[in-house]
């Protein structure tokens, strides 16, 4: 090997080494533990800058269960459960499957009602074209899909904040392209849910919905965020899982904290609460 060939080889080895990469193009570097503060900052900034450029001023945040299915899916689940129970009437798993299928089918009404609510909100923001009251969800299936779908069917925009999970989660197809953001950090995602929020509507859901609800209640309780209507959709459902009055009776929250939220039972009532809170009529 000539001296030039040896020199060229050494230069190539230098340039191929990760240390030579531009810092912002070095994924191993960017993903390192020491760079977590930078990743947190970027995850906060990217959606903020995008939404600013799109003129999105405020949102209506909709939470709810991923397992709240549209009617046809609920009916299919019920048919499957019935068939399994008829085949093995003494099987405890088949009995349990039947109970769950009955409840999923019952809750399918919430999918349709959420869809209708999102249409009401979207028809308003379409009328004024001012970047206000844009539907925002977590981007998944169930209630989140219903809200994005309602906005889509009304011919308007809606956005979503998706999250990376150990199991694959893809965004639903009704989100407006260019308005779906993927997050790695739950904390930054939660912050973005509330930064532009002018209302929070919690449809029936599980741990994730409860997490977002109690985060918002805590921030309102402590005066750490803007005053917004916090709406629990379906008093029947929420009374069944949380006894808020018990918390007040036990003295662990103030009686006044019960005024931080309210219940609604129809799409129209829910939208009326938001309109009244913000002082506008249609």
Task: Give each language-model segment a name.
Residues 155-168, 203, 217-240, 256:
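Short, acidic/small-residue loops that bind anionic groups at enzyme active sites
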Residues 232-282:
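C-terminal functional extensions of proteins
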Residues 8-9, 14-158:
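Glycine-rich beta-alpha loop segments
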Residues 2-4, 8, 12, 276-282:
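C-terminal amphipathic helix plus adjacent low-complexity
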Residues 77-79, 152-153, 215-220, 246-250, ...:
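Short, solvent-exposed amphipathic alpha-helical segments in soluble enzyme
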């Amino acid at each position: 090997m000539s001296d030039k060939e040896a020199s060229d080889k050494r230069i190539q080895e230098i340039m191929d080494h990760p240390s030579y990469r531009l810092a912002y193009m070095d994924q191993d570097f960017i993903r390192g533990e020491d760079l977590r503060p930078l990743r947190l900052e970027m995850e906060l900034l990217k959606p903020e800058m995008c939404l600013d450029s799109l003129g999105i001023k405020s949102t209506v945040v909709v939470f709810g269960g991923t397992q709240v299915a549209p009617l046809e899916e609920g009916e299919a689940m019920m048919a499957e459960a019935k068939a399994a129970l008829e085949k093995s009437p003494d099987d405890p798993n088949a009995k349990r499957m039947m109970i769950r299928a009955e409840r999923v089918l019952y809750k399918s009404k919430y999918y349709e009602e959420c869809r209708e609510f999102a249409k009401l909100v979207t028809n308003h923001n379409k009328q004024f074209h001012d970047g206000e009251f844009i539907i925002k969800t977590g981007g998944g299936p169930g209630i989140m899909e219903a809200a994005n779908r309602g906005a889509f069917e009304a011919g308007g925009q809606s956005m979503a904040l998706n999250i990376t999970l150990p199991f694959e989660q893809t965004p639903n197809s009704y989100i407006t392209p260019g308005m779906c953001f993927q997050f790695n950090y739950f904390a930054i995602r939660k912050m973005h849910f509330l930064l532009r929020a002018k209302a929070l509507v919690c449809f029936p859901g599980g741990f994730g919905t409860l997490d977002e609800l109690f985060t918002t209640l805590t921030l309102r309780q402590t005066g750490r965020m803007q005053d917004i209507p916090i709406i629990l959709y379906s008093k029947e459902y929420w009374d069944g899982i949380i006894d808020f009055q018990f918390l007040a009776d036990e003295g662990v929250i103030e009686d006044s904290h019960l005024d931080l939220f309210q219940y609604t039972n129809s799409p129209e009532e829910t939208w009326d609460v938001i309109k009244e809170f913000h002082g506008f009529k249609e």
